[in-house]
Amino acid sequence: MTIPSPSLTALDPVEPFDPIVARLTRLHPKVIDLTLERLQRLLARLDHPEQHLPPVIHVAGTNGKGSTVAFLRAMLEAGGNRVHVLTSPHLISFTERIRLAGRLIEEPYLVQLLEECEAANGEAPITFFEMAMAAATLAFARVPADYLLLEVGLGGRYDATNIIPRTAVSVITPIGIDHKEFLGDTLAQIAGEKAGIIKP
């Protein structure tokens, strides 16, 4: 299912002056296309950084994902753990989405990672969020940490964050009716999509 977003604010509010967002939007038009194939191809070209991540806590749901990630991060860091985090959307700067061992990713490093991903991807089609996830995955694989907290962007089963091969914990927050055009018309269908992050 491929649906062009009518505007950058449709599902993922961003600030138009953010240079990272401008770069991603210019090179990779923002399209919602729920599949993992493009990202799998790109990560293979990058030598599979998703295979070298710290233990992952993956959070899906309709309500409370961001709060749950924030609570988990606070608890883990209070216990002395180094924690990577991926959340969305951001408020002011795209760098707010990625924390490396407790600190926001620095813009020059993120640009470097995006350039590496763009070079590996070439002219192949890819979405805004998939390219961002590829860059974040490189960072998470290269910077040591004890845990990685991933917040699902949309749904779960075909969300770009579900590229990870395994999780330490999968968390489902309260589920409601949302994004029916992508996830289904019933609560059961939507729950099934979000439960797609659960792995053996």
Please provide the spans of the model-predicted regions.
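Charged, amphipathic alpha-helical linker segments immediately N-terminal to NTP-binding catalytic cores
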Residues: M1-I32
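ATP-dependent carboxylate-amine ligase catalytic core
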Residues: L11-D12, K30-I32, L36-R45, P49-P54, ...
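Hydrophobic anchor at the beta1->P-loop junction of P-loop NTPases
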Residues: I57-V59
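Hydrophobic positions on the alpha1 helix immediately C-terminal to the Walker A/P-loop
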Residues: S67-F71
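Conserved Switch II/interswitch segment of TRAFAC-class P-loop GTPases
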Residues: P174-F182
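Membrane-proximal helix-turn-helix segments that form the acceptor-binding/catalytic region
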Residues: A191-K199
